[in-house]
Amino acid sequence: MKVIQAKSAGFCYGVQRAVELAEQTARERGGCVMLGSIIHNAHVVQHLEQLGAHQVAGPEEIRPGDTVLIRAHGEKKQVIGHLKDIGAECVDATCPNVLRVQQIVAQADAEGRVPIIIGDPNHPEVMGVASWSARSVVFEGAETLQRWLDEDPARRELPLTAVAQTTCIRIIWDGAAEILKKQCTNAKIFDTICNATHKRQSEAAELASQVDVMVVVGDRKSANTKHLTEICSRQCPAVYQIERAEELKRDFLTGCSVAGLTAGASTPAGIIKEVYTTMSEEIKTMEPTEESFEEMLEKSFKTLNTGEKVTGIVTAVGPTEVQVDLGCKQAGY
């Protein structure tokens, strides 16, 4: 039995940049304010709070002069404006890929186009992107997009600009994009799924198809971790999403020959290593100990001494003797 870890598991560039910027800001400023979770990982947020980065739930808790970290998912345009108006200093940790999507939507708005966003309408990244145009419409996938188009056939003639949540599942985006290509007459389509996400999802799907059990590590609030779990579940019958090694259960690996391991973009390397080590140790304790050829050969040459007490198996009974297997080259009569 063995464990195979996906090469792309762990922090992506955008998350790494955000965490490093948060650490640097907290140290240099003697503390700062995080507007929401800078990334979706409770353990990282706890680490940053220990450095002096205090988390608040909303902009109403921020005071003039505060140094405010904008999370990797980005923030609503109106919130950024409010922070500047009250005199707060913004340190922007928004992922560059998310910034690009915001810019595309802002440009579409300036051109009078209708931004179509494929993603989770309740995710902070999507809410932030949508805020750059009052005309933005968000769809979770092809089904809801198709329903919107069918409600008013004239919408197929609208000037549309389509983008994806950067962590969107590829098959969901492709389905929506195909509808726009075939049914709409004036649609600009931008594939904004980031390369790291695409690589991670493709690798996870391939690995999941080759293993008996797949373990996905990441915070339960993490969209990309959730998507990895969904993707792996299409390829592997036994998929488990956990946050830490402590959540691993022995029965996860029962009857498993090969186990796979991947992790979301906001999962620290230390946690991934911890899970990998725990899985490897668990597998070792489950594997039966096999005797080497030398050990078996040595046992076969074992000699017995007169008066020695041994245990054997009766193999034959005759009129004048009983034959006993003593587990060596000698037999007892």
Each model region followed by its residue ranges:
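The feature marks the mature, well-folded catalytic cores of soluble enzymes
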Residues: 1-283
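Single-stranded RNA-binding regions, centering on S1/OB-family and related RNA-binding modules
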Residues: 284-333
